[in-house]
């Protein structure tokens, strides 16, 4: 008797949870929701939609976790059309090697644009273009530009995502350049819950010197009708690389 009552109670709880999640799914946010730590996915803001995003990165070197640099970004995104959006970042930073870490300070402005070349699943592989212009707060430093080719292929709830990235100092080739490749796998457990695994590598060239970094890590993304949260950790794979870990969280508010 007790076992039967317990089974009925568990069934009611399960039905209630499924019903609540289904209701949340029907009210999923019209937002640029992130799942990956590093890679951008095939999505832009809907036309006329405004979103506030708060990014927090912890860049931990191999020397000691206390030497980490914390980077905070405040971003406003706006959908110019359903396939083209614009974003403005204000970037702040603090921390670094002990015993003299940098205090909290304004680091840079960044202007970003993204454009989806077609609607989702119209092409064999979804393609999006990304461009970014950065103005460091130190006016003695040159502008920086960044380009991304963003590719995505969906297989039902599963999606494969790849980014090819280039970054340069504007009109200052002597200061070097950076190439990056990101590859991730995303799975939608529920419309409100996604999980992912991601690998990425960066190669920074300055004259004859090359600094290479390799990372692998998991991430999770949850969403409601008004906000979403992404959290992930990338672990350095090469014992000789400078950075040991990247921890990233992004909180988005649909305004």
What do these predicted regions represent?
Residues 31-254:
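Transmembrane beta-barrel domains of Gram-negative outer membranes and organellar outer membranes
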Residues 1-11:
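N-terminal secretory signal peptides that target proteins for export/translocation
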Residues 17-19, 29:
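Cleavable N-terminal signal peptides
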């Amino acid at each position: 008797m007790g076992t039967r009552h317990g089974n009925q109670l568990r069934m009611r709880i399960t039905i209630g949870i499924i019903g609540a999640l289904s209701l949340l799914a029907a009210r999923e946010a019209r937002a640029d929701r992130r799942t990956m730590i590093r890679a951008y996915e095939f999505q832009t803001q809907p036309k006329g939609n405004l979103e506030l995003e708060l990014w927090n990165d912890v860049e931990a070197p191999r020397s000691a976790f206390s030497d980490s640099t914390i980077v905070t970004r405040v971003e406003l995104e706006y959908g110019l059309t359903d396939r083209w959006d614009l974003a403005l970042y204000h970037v702040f930073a603090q921390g670094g090697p002990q015993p003299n870490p940098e205090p909290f300070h304004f680091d840079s402005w960044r202007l970003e644009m993204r454009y989806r070349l077609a609607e989702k699943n119209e092409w064999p592989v979804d393609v999006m273009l990304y461009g970014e212009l950065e103005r460091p707060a130190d006016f003695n430093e040159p502008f920086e530009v960044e380009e991304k080719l963003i590719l995505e292929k969906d297989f039902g709830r599963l999606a494969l995502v790849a980014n090819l990235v280039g970054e340069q100092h504007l009109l200052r080739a002597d200061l070097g350049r950076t190439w990056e490749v990101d590859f991730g796998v995303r799975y939608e457990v529920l419309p409100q819950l996604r999980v992912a695994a991601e690998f990425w590598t960066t190669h920074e060239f300055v004259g004859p010197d090359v600094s290479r970094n390799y990372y692998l890590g998991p991430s999770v993304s949850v969403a409601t009708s008004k906000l979403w949260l992404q959290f992930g950790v990338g672990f350095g794979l090469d014992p000789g690389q400078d950075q040991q870990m990247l921890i990233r969280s992004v909180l988005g508010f649909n305004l």
